[in-house]
Curated annotation (Swiss-Prot):
Keyword list, A-Z: Cobalt, Hydrolase, Metal-binding, Zinc
Pfam families (UniProt xref): M20_dimer, Peptidase_M20
Superkingdom assignment: Archaea
One GO molecular-function entry: hydrolase activity
Binding of Zn(2+) 2, residues: 121, 156, 392
Gene3D superfamilies in alphabetical order: 3.30.70.360, Zn peptidases (3.40.630.10)
Cofactor(s) in the UniProt record: Zn(2+); Co(2+)
Record protein name field: Uncharacterized metallohydrolase MMP1398
Cofactor note: Binds 2 Zn(2+) or Co(2+) ions per subunit.
Amino acid sequence: MKSILDETIELSSDLISINSVNPTFGGIGEKEKSIYIKNKLEEYNKNYSIKNCEITEYNTVDSEGIERPNIVSKYDFGKNDTLTIISHMDIVPEGDLGLWNSDPFKAEIKDGIIYGRGSEDNHKGIVSSFLLLKMIFEEKIDPKYNLNLIFVADEEDGSKYGLSYLVNNFEDEIFSSKDLIIVPDFGMPEGEFIEIAEKNILWLKFKITGKQCHGSVPENGINADLIAFSFGKGLYDKLYGKYDGINPIFNPAFSTFEPTILKNNIENINTIPGYVELNFDCRIIPKYDPKEVLSDIENYIEVFKNEIEKHILHFDISEKENISITYEILKLEKAEETKKDSEVVKKLGSAIKNVLNKESVLCGMGGGTVAAFLREKGYNTAVWGIGDETAHQPNEHIKIENLIKMAEVYLDILK
């Protein structure tokens, strides 16, 4: 059998070499990576003579006809409760290659660190899951819990074809209320932080219609850019002003309402645009209901339109009634919080103390993980890992020793 170090390097290197960029971002998806994972699971079953394993594929097809795979590997150790570890197979694009010091899809190892796209997000979950299996069967321990290893698609684009698909269609088949669920899709360098809460996520696309005209005669049209600028700033001020509560478990501790994408329908400098799209990324602390935020947005749209003269100096007043501001909800994920005294939080905290010699710290975050879907269904879920916070960045990387430490923490829970 390979050493734990050699196994870690091989698994990480193999996964980095398989491009599984989410199709929404122009990639080919997770199929090839899922084949590798399933074959590796079967290889482990053979090498360690594992008889109590059931591997099930829950594949679906997305709107573009691309197969989106999900794998659930169950290990029955004859126990009443189950430790469930959920990792995702899709990755984000590599971005500007000029910012990388190496090929993002060819692992590079330097000073005990492995570099490559996906190395942290979320290969650390996949690799540490396999290392856990290696430890269980080489050390021949009798685990206190059954074990479920779940590998899902589509996390980077909202999980419609991944965990959301599993929870909405196969919940009773896969999950139990007694499960200890860990999502290794977060992590700080020392590994002491356990994420138990996420902010509500609300992504909006505003569609703003004015009237296109020549740039030299603004009074013949309605400048949709100006509407977008003024509307965006006004909405920004209104939402930050009203939803100003603080929850210190998060960093930042407040809700955020940030305009992001702004684009119009013209390419030449001497045309006033008649149509603009403006996107907002809202991360709302759990005390506030996103439905209330949406209601305030709808009210603000009407107020803004009625006061349009305050925002544009020169425009075709006869077309005022044709000004349109509508919105599309791109994502709405309502957040629930894992109980601080839940079994998974207590067991994970104890394992962190035993293995890492760190006192665990409970926290929340503004980013989203698949834990949101489970918490919404009432499952206490801990998001945890060890990493250097390089996800989605050029030169993404992770320390090889931290992949092994993650598996040791899981193992401590099972002992």
